[in-house]
Amino acid sequence: MLVIGESINASNKSVAEAIAGRDREFLENLAKAEAAAGADFIDVNAGAGYSSPEREMAAMEWLVDVVQGATDKPLTIDSDNPSMIKVALGKYRGERLIINSVTAEPERLESIGSLAAERQAWLVALAMGTSGIPNNVEERLAACDQIMEQLTHLGLREEQIFFDPLVLPIAVDSTQGIVTLKTLQEIKSRYPDARTVMGLSNISYGLPNRKLVNRAFLLMAAYAGLDAVILDPLDAKTMGFIKV
């Protein structure tokens, strides 16, 4: 199973501060730690909410440069903004990469899908359309069908697509874990050459003993056909589950 290190994300306060302050050493050390812990890819997310598009682009460009200089691990470019992704791809020197992510929303699917096809990147596709996250398996699969049709039309191969079945907190709706696992199984059945990925920590949001919940769900997802996971590789016990 591929591991995508999630730590270099501006939703984390310390990372956001490091990006804003251009603290190269902090981010280099974090990237090196994720790589040493066993991450196969390093996710980079420079965040949003900047005072201008130019500042937003500059932050992503700088972040990609810092992280790829700290490790030889390939990167996951984490943004749903086509302009941000294009800037990041222009700075990225590696051959292997993942773009994270698209939905079935037509305009961004076209623009981001085209960027992925041009670079022959792997692409994460969320099982949702324009109306938010579906709460049932059928609507998530319908979104996957739309995405697959468009991306293959743009020139991506099935095996370049990582479908994310979507993970919602079971503290809010206890049925959502089952919905995710069933969606995962159906994706693998419909598209045997496609890959699957999920962000693990969402499942336990709002619960005590979150790491225990995460580990239990990871095992169930692996059994259902999960190919890759976005998580904190510095959590040695969870990484131990993957290495078993």
List the predicted regions and their residue ranges.
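Glycine-rich, proline-tolerant flexible connector loops at the mouths of alpha/beta enzymes
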Residues: 35-73, 165-177
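Active-site-adjacent beta->alpha loops and helix N-cap segments on the catalytic face
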Residues: 51-62, 79-87, 104-117, 132-142, ...
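Structural preference for beta-strand elements that scaffold enzyme active sites
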Residues: 1-3, 40-43, 74-76, 96-98, ...
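Catalytic alpha/beta core domains of metabolic enzymes, predominantly
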Residues: 119-244
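Active-site mouth loops of central-metabolism enzymes
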Residues: 4-29, 53-55, 100-106, 131-138, ...
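Catalytic beta/alpha-barrel core
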Residues: 43-46, 73-81, 96-107, 124-127, ...
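Acidic (Asp/Glu)-rich catalytic clusters
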Residues: 35-36, 69, 89-93, 110-121, ...
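Alpha-helix-loop-beta-strand connector modules within alpha/beta enzyme cores
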Residues: 53-79, 83-94, 181-198
